[in-house]
Amino acid sequence: MERGTSDEVGYATGLWHMVQAGLRELFPGYFALIMATGIISLACGMLGLPILAQALFRLNIVNYAVIATLMLARLIGYPRLMLADLTDHARGPGFFTSIAGSCVLGTQFVVIGHESSVAWILWGVGVTLSFTVIYAFFAAVTLRGVKPDLETGINGAWLIATVGSQSIAILSTLLLPTAGAYKTALVTFALIMYLMGCMTYLTIIPLILYRFTFFRLTPAELTPPYWINMGAVAITTLAGATLIMNAGRSSLLTAILPFLKGLTLYFWATATWWIPLLLILGVWRHLYRHFPLRYSPQYWGMVFPLGMYTACTIRLSQAVDLPLLAPVTPYLLAIALFAWSLTFAGLIHELVRDFGRPRLPESPARPH
């Protein structure tokens, strides 16, 4: 009996220390799980798979609640670590996923849940985070005295700034029917966020391509978030297509419709251009250089672009009347679902392993 009690106390102590260590080192970009699950759910709905779309929607509500709770717990328990991560060139952009995650879930509430009141709350969260997190990060990395060089300071996660802006543009456009007297203001805001997202992509992507081509790139440095090179323009395509499909609600959108169509096609072509190169780099990383393929939360940064490319291709084919794109979309969705399933299985395996064998840490990894 005493042995059993001692084991239970030891397990509980180990579990508590494991939770503390997990909060200290919590990956800032974990909202990418919500982004990936949400966009694949929406793509399933677009292709007539309502049961799967609903299941992923309900799962995403749980995902959001858990991750938001963990992030708040980390903010309360380890504010200095949160601030250090936010102002770090490499880890800081991960916080941008909270913007996109909130708005992607809000889009699910509109499209799948048919519940605009919750979507408005998530829209407010996304907009607030956009104007706090993004400007806090860029101000911090601009003003800090010691800065990394381009080789170590930039990565694909920087483009989540674009993803965040475009996710707000999409949700804002979808909320137009419930905006009432504020419809004109909301559609103008949606268009501004869309153009801001275009601006950030066109500003950041030359730096990433320059880093790719003129600096040594190791397998460890070729992280999954580099798929956001494609995902950022995929969501820009989806935002443009959403504005085009809702142009009848606004004289402003109607006036610039040819511009929107051309720009949207341009960004879809850019997203398509990236896919072969990213596949080649992935083969080089894992098959040629034998970099181990094991679960990391960063892989959600690869799953999201796959789902987003599927969704944007579906909507683009409808927005600009390009039916020739439609036949390929079920295959794109199958690939995205396969990638999501593997990554989610990796997450579950890691959780089962960690909670099954909690260990006492030797010492805290970083101070509060």
List each language-model region with its residue ranges.
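Juxtamembrane helix-loop boundaries in multi-pass membrane proteins
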Residues: 12-42, 57, 79-107, 123-126, ...
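Short, hydrophobic transmembrane alpha-helix segments
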Residues: 44-55
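Extracellular/periplasmic helix-loop-helix junctions in multi-pass membrane proteins
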Residues: 50-51, 179-187, 247-258, 287-291, ...
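Central hydrophobic cores of alpha-helical transmembrane segments in multi-pass inner-membrane proteins
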Residues: 61-76, 130-139
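Small-residue-rich transmembrane alpha-helices that serve as helix-helix interface/gating elements
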Residues: 63, 268-270, 327-342
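Hydrophobic, ordered structural segments
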Residues: 103-144, 173, 187-190, 203, ...
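Generic multipass alpha-helical transmembrane bundles of integral membrane proteins
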Residues: 158-281
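Extended, compositionally biased non-globular segments
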Residues: 260-318
